[in-house]
Amino acid sequence: MTCPICGSKTAPSYRPFCSKRCADLDLAKWLNGSYAIPASSEDEEEPLDQEAETPVAPRH
């Protein structure tokens, strides 16, 4: 198996990456929005005002 970032052989402790550096680079891509999981319109949540129609029990 090769590292998806640089193509080097993977290290067991960082699998599927070869090093902490490549793992961190991949995490940074997720955090800055370079990677995204597409959503279909069916997956969209209901607007918040519709969810509020359900009564909420008072807190003690």
UniProtKB/Swiss-Prot annotation:
Cofactors named for this entry: Zn(2+)
**Where is this chain compositionally biased, Acidic residues type?**
41-52
SUPFAM superfamilies hit by this protein:
Glucocorticoid receptor-like (DNA-binding domain)
The membrane spanning regions, by residue number, are none
The record ties this protein, via Gene3D superfamilies, to:
Erythroid Transcription Factor GATA-1, subunit A
Q: Which Pfam families match?
A: YacG
Instruction: Kindly list the GO molecular function terms attached to this UniProt entry.
Output: DNA topoisomerase type II (double strand cut, ATP-hydrolyzing) inhibitor activity; zinc ion binding
GO BP terms: namely: regulation of DNA-templated transcription
Supply the alphabetized keyword list. Answer: Metal-binding, Plasmid, Zinc
* Family matches, as InterPro entries: DNA_gyrase_inhibitor_YacG, Znf_NHR/GATA
Q: Which family does it belong to?
A: Belongs to the DNA gyrase inhibitor YacG family.
- Subunit organization: Interacts with GyrB.
Name of this protein: DNA gyrase inhibitor YacG
Question: What's the source species' lineage?
Answer: Bacteria, Pseudomonadati, Pseudomonadota, Alphaproteobacteria, Rhodobacterales
Q: Which gene encodes it?
A: yacG
